């Protein structure tokens, strides 16, 4: 895969207030400021403007090897999937290998249950905005973010109202390394451009899906998650001069609860149209 990226940035920062912009030339409080007063003139300043121009031409090569095995023990069936994924990126001459394995267990129970466990190493090569620093320069030494993951799951298939339904549950833990930290300001995302943090994510996902309306699949899900990161070498001093290292702090993507519904129905009297 070939990637060609051209990037041009000219960025200004302006803080707007009532009748003037910040930073502004101070005036005496309570005085009337004429419209032609210098305090009403935009003063961008050196720290509120930057420009840059970047162009990169890189190559990526990916590949994988995977196999599957099926076996039985007593009345229980097992499906084992294993493999490894390879990735090379010419921008930083980085080669990664990601081994993964997944086991699915199908017990011969009266009720239709299945269980699974997955683990592996997952690499995520940085995309362009992650390797661009806040000042517009590119980090040619940036490395892929990666995680060690383990996930346990269960699946229950059943009938309700004589229609098929499925209830799934997943519990996971992910240890994150080489993170590229970022800040979120409304819709604006600013990446540090450095592998400057480690972190973790853990949670549980539950989903009920099925034909609430005959012939149409709908679903409802509930997720609980906690994710935090520890910035390398971050610290501050209290007014008393005491050194404080914050340790793990909440990531911008931390979302403790998420509840989602997707529901379909037919238009009364004309079933081909769905809502």
What do these predicted regions represent?
Residues 54-60, 92-96, 141-147, 187-189, ...:
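Transmembrane beta-barrel outer-membrane domains
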């Amino acid at each position: 895969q070939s990637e060609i990226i051209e990037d041009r940035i000219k960025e200004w920062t302006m803080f707007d207030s009532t009748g003037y912009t910040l930073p502004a030339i101070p005036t005496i409080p309570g005085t009337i400021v004429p419209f032609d007063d210098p305090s009403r003139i935009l003063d961008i300043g050196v720290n509120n403007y930057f420009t840059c121009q970047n162009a990169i031409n890189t190559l990526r090569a990916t590949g994988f090897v995977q196999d599957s095995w099926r076996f039985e023990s007593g009345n229980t069936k097992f499906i084992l999937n294993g493999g490894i994924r390879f990735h090379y990126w010419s921008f930083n001459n980085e080669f990664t290998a990601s081994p993964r394995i997944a086991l699915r267990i199908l017990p011969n129970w009266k009720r239709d249950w299945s269980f699974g466990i997955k683990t592996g190493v997952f690499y995520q090569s940085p995309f362009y905005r992650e390797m661009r620093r806040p000042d517009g320069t590119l980090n040619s030494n940036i490395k892929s973010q990666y995680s060690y993951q383990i996930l346990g799951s269960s699946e229950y298939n059943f009938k309700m109202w004589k229609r098929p339904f499925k209830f799934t549950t997943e519990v996971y833990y992910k240890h994150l390394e080489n993170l590229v930290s970022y800040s979120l300001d409304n819709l604006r995302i600013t990446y540090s451009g450095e592998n400057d943090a480690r972190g973790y994510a853990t949670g549980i996902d539950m989903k009920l899906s099925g034909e609430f309306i005959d012939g149409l699949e709908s679903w409802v899900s509930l997720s609980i998650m906690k994710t935090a990161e520890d910035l390398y070498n971050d610290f501050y001093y209290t007014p008393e001069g005491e050194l404080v290292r914050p340790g793990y702090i909440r990531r911008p993507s931390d979302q403790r609860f998420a509840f989602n519904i997707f529901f379909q129905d037919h238009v009364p009297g004309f079933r081909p149209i769905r809502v």
